[in-house]
Amino acid sequence: MNKQELIDAVAAQTGASKAQTGETLDTLLEVIKKAVSKGDSVQLIGFGSFGSGKRAARTGRNPKTGETIKIPAAKTVKFTAGKAFKDAVNKR
């Protein structure tokens, strides 16, 4: 399912317009991005939580040339599925 299909499905279930649903989804995603970018976590009970982590700098190797390269430290995005979401996927 892509973003437009998600918008269509939510609009059909809620009776809201597709434009309104699309705007709401865009706003929701923007709020999550801003919070996680600041280092906060976003917890949606029953669904999961979004957060950020840190990956330390490390040494890597170019598989083509065998040359050793330095990989800089980076922030990562993490999503942890909630129990209810996992159970729904596994149909427990």
Swiss-Prot record:
SUPFAM superfamilies: IHF-like DNA-binding proteins. The keyword Chaperone does not apply. Keywords: DNA condensation, DNA-binding. One of its GO terms (molecular function) is DNA binding. It comes from the Bacteria. CDD domains: HU (cd13831). Gene3D superfamilies: IHF-like DNA-binding proteins (4.10.520.10). GO terms for biological process: chromosome condensation. Pfam families: Bac_DNA_binding. PROSITE patterns: HISTONE_LIKE. Heterodimer of an alpha and a beta chain. Belongs to the bacterial histone-like protein family. Histone-like DNA-binding protein which is capable of wrapping DNA to stabilize it, and thus to prevent its denaturation under extreme environmental conditions. This is DNA-binding protein HU-alpha. The gene is hupA.
